[in-house]
Amino acid sequence: MPAFRIRTLLLALVLIAPIASAQDHAAPDQPRTDQPRPDQSRPEAIDPLYTAAPSSLAPDDIASLQQRLADWPQLARYREANAHLEAPKPGERRVVFYGDSITDNWGRQQDTAFFPGKPYVNRGIAGQTTPQMLVRFRQDVIDLKPAAVLILAGTNDIAGNSGVSTPEMIEDNLRSMAELARAHHIRVILASILPVSDYPWRRGLQPADKVRALNAWIKQYAAANGAVYLDYYSAMANQDGGLDAELAGDGVHPTPAGYARMAPLAEKAIERALSH
């Protein structure tokens, strides 16, 4: 492939593909279990393919990059698991947890459990932003026929994982997901973004005020539109608007102690949503 075509491909990928942490590469398609998995709480380094000189790329490298670009929303991630997931049993009130790496790692990270015995389904994908989540919302939420969906999203948009993003863009995507859910009689739980004072894969963005502002919008939107607001932020933020190391070793991804603090808050929000 001529060098200029490779450069074009790489530029497109850098602009729209997830670039780090989130950036944690998620585990293969498997139904959710309570078995501990390797620690995925810390982001990996940026994939070297994204920064390699075009002339150094082998044909297999180029094919790998093309494949990632072809499935930007990562619809393949849960396709097989969804196909094997049975419809909810009569009386079962399924809940889909929908998000990025913070959701994806819940139950995969060592010493964390994903609500054993509960009819909850995890459909988080590490690194995702709200436009990616909106694209896969039908496949990974609506088609699973849940009673409720718990949406935790937006921090990777602020980090710029899939390119430039404005508050209005994030709000529009969250609003669209909520509207799709309501149109299919799915109760909506909108979670606050977790506190963050810096992104380890993109230093210097000073996101704390942006997180607070977006959370204020999420809270207002939930109140005005019959959704339940799940306030993780207030229970986890330190005085700097970030997360203490006990709750998130890298300042973004919860530790087992962080998930232990989040779990009862999620349960209460689900109870509220399903009681309406």
Set out the residue ranges of the language-model regions.
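Alpha-helical cap/lid subdomain in secreted, periplasmic
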Residues: T112-V121, Q128, Q132-H276
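Short hydrophobic segments within beta-strands
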Residues: Y98-G99, A191
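N-terminal secretory targeting modules
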Residues: M1-V96, T103, R108, L144, ...
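Short, functionally important structural connectors and interaction interfaces within domains
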Residues: T8, Q67, R77, R94, ...
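Alpha-helical protein-protein interaction elements
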Residues: R42, S64, A70, P90, ...
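Conserved beta-strand elements of the Class I
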Residues: V96-Y98, V121
